[in-house]
Amino acid sequence: MKIAILTLPLHTNYGGLLQAYALQSALERMGYEVSVLDKIRKPKVQIPFSVSVKRLIMKFILRKNVAPIGQLEDYKRRKKRNTNTWKFADKYIHRHELDNLGSIKEDDYDVFVVGSDQIWRREYILNSFKCVEDAFLGFAKTWNVKRIAYAPSFGHDVWDYTPEETVSIRALLRLFDYLSVREESGVELCMRELGLTTKHVADPTMLLTAEDYKVLIKNTSKSSGNLLCYVLDMTEEADLKPELAWVKTTVLVP
């Protein structure tokens, strides 16, 4: 049986990469053939040949300063920054690269699993897919396939979909064979806004053991002794001063 995992595109988000890897691993251990749907990596724009030639002449023959083309330069920066995360994705995640979800055919997969990550956060959907309905398997609404939502997240406890989108989402989710979300607030949103009952389940990263993750780092070089503090949202509640004070008493340097 072939399973496709639909999540947000795999870029620099460590959590996104790990949840995709964990869900893939958990399903493979059950004996399934698993692929993670992912966007082809490329610049957002294609530069016309004539423009490229003109820029090369100005820069290398006429020795003129040439302003960078924003999106291309952004892609180059992202490519450099993403070196290690892309390396992880290419090595450990079975990616099915595609330009858009419309290129998938009904007989490509038997099951579609949506999740985890903030795949149901509206602003992220609009930045990643053609339309809101794609994140709810709108492209496959007439197909004879199994549909599962495992631990997707709305990203917050506010419903920001339009009334028209809400109607479409409700109809699409009613086609699912199993519905679950990552947060309790997601359970409440589904009931209040869609009239649908969902289960509250653990993030896919919790499906693996510590030993599963240790295997991934067994061949890495030893730490230099320094410490990286990664804080998603710095708030008063997330004050790290006590922890940093303790860290400074050790050999670690935050």
Describe each PLM feature range.
Residues 1-254:
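Active-site anion-handling motifs in enzyme catalytic cores
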